C-alpha cells in the first residue's frame, strides 16, 4: 500500500517572485492539488495562494495552525526585569519586532512608525530580533534619522521568548505573510500587537491584536501605539486563549501523531 502524499502551504506570497523564478513557482504549484492526498495550509490566504480558490471552497484544504509552545512564552515579570536590565532599558517604552530582515517584513515602515513615536515619547526604544539582507539598509536609515542610540539590533536569538517579556508593544507591518508565528508568540506573552492589514485575521487569537493599513501615513500607526501605551503595560496571561484557538504545539503534536498513525482525522479544520 502506497503512503499518502501530503503537501503544506505556508506563504500567501507563493509565486510573487518576478521573472523566471515566479513563473516556475506557479507552474510547479499546479500538480500539487491534483496529486496530493492531503492539502494542508497554515491559513486560508496561504491555501488559496497555493491550491486555488476552488480547492479551498470545496473543503479539500485543511488549516493546521503554526502552533507554538504557549507555556514557553507566557509573561514573567522577573524575566522582563532581567532582560531590560541587561539591555539598559529599564525605564524605557519598548517597541519590539521579531522577524527576518527581508523586504516582506517592511522594516523601513517600522522605522518610520518608530520615528513618529519618538517625537512624542523621548523614552521610546526599538528592539529588533532577526537577521537578513535588509539589515544594513535599516541600520543606515536609523542612523540618518539620528536614532541609533534608541535602536537595538539583537540578531537571531534562541531565547527569543525572554525578549517578548521585555517589550511593551509588538509592531508587525509586513507586506505579506502566511500566518506569522511571531504574532502568536507575542500574544502568548500578553503583548498588544499592531499588525499590518496584509496579515491574515486568523492570527488574531486574542483581543490584543489590532490591524492597520500599511498604505496609510505611519503617523496613524504611531498615534494608535501612543493612545494604547498605558493600557499595554497591563499584561494578561493569554496561554489558555492561545491554546483554545488550536495554537498550542503540545496539544497539536498529539493530534498530528495520531493522524500520521491512522491516516484519518487531520488536526485543524477544513478551510472554507
Regions found by a protein language model. Give the residues of each.
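A conserved, positively charged/aromatic
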Residues: 4, 8-44, 48-56
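Acidic anion/phosphate-binding donor-loop and adjacent secondary structure
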Residues: 48-52, 59-60, 65-86, 250, ...
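A conserved mid-protein helix/loop that constitutes part of the nucleotide-sugar donor-binding site
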Residues: 93, 97-116, 133-139
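Nucleotide-activated donor-binding/catalytic signature segment of Leloir-type glycosyltransferases, i.e.
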Residues: 139-155
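Aromatic "clamp/platform" in nucleotide-sugar-dependent glycosyltransferases that forms part
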Residues: 156, 175
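Short hydrophobic beta-strand element within catalytic cores of glycosyltransferases
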Residues: 192-196, 201
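A charged, aromatic-enriched C-terminal amphipathic alpha-helix characteristic of glycosyltransferases
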Residues: 232-268
Amino acid at each position: 500500500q502506497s503512503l499518502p502524499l501530503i503537501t503544506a502551504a505556508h506563504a500567501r506570497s507563493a509565486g510573487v517572485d518576478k521573472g523566471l523564478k515566479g513563473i516556475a513557482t506557479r507552474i510547479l504549484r499546479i500538480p500539487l492539488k491534483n496529486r496530493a492526498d492531503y492539502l494542508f495550509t497554515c491559513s486560508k490566504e496561504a491555501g488559496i495562494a497555493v491550491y486555488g480558490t476552488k480547492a479551498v471552497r470545496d473543503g479539500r484544504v485543511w488549516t493546521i495552525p503554526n502552533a507554538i509552545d504557549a507555556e514557553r512564552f507566557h509573561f514573567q515579570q522577573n524575566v522582563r526585569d532581567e532582560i531590560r536590565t541587561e539591555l539598559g532599558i529599564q525605564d524605557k517604552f519598548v517597541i519590539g519586532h521579531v522577524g527576518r530582515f527581508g523586504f516582506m517584513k517592511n522594516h523601513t515602515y517600522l522605522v518610520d512608525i518608530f520615528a513618529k513615536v519618538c517625537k512624542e515619547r523621548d523614552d521610546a526604544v526599538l528592539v529588533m530580533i532577526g537577521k537578513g539582507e535588509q539589515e544594513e539598509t535599516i541600520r543606515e536609515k536609523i542612523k540618518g534619522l539620528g536614532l541609533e542610540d534608541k535602536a537595538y539590533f539583537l540578531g537571531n536569538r534562541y531565547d527569543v521568548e525572554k525578549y517578548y517579556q521585555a517589550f511593551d508593544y509588538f509592531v508587525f507591518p509586513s507586506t505579506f505573510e502566511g500566518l506569522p508565528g511571531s504574532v502568536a508568540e507575542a500574544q502568548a506573552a500578553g503583548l498588544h500587537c499592531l499588525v499590518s492589514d496584509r496579515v491574515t485575521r486568523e492570527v488574531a487569537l486574542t483581543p490584543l491584536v489590532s490591524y492597520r493599513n500599511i498604505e496609510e501615513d505611519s503617523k496613524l500607526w504611531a498615534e494608535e501605539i501612543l493612545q494604547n501605551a498605558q493600557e499595554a503595560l497591563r499584561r494578561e496571561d493569554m496561554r489558555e486563549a492561545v491554546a483554545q484557538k488550536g495554537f498550542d504545539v503540545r496539544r497539536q503534536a498529539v493530534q498530528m501523531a495520531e493522524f500520521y498513525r491512522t491516516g484519518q482525522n487531520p488536526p485543524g479544520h477544513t478551510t472554507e
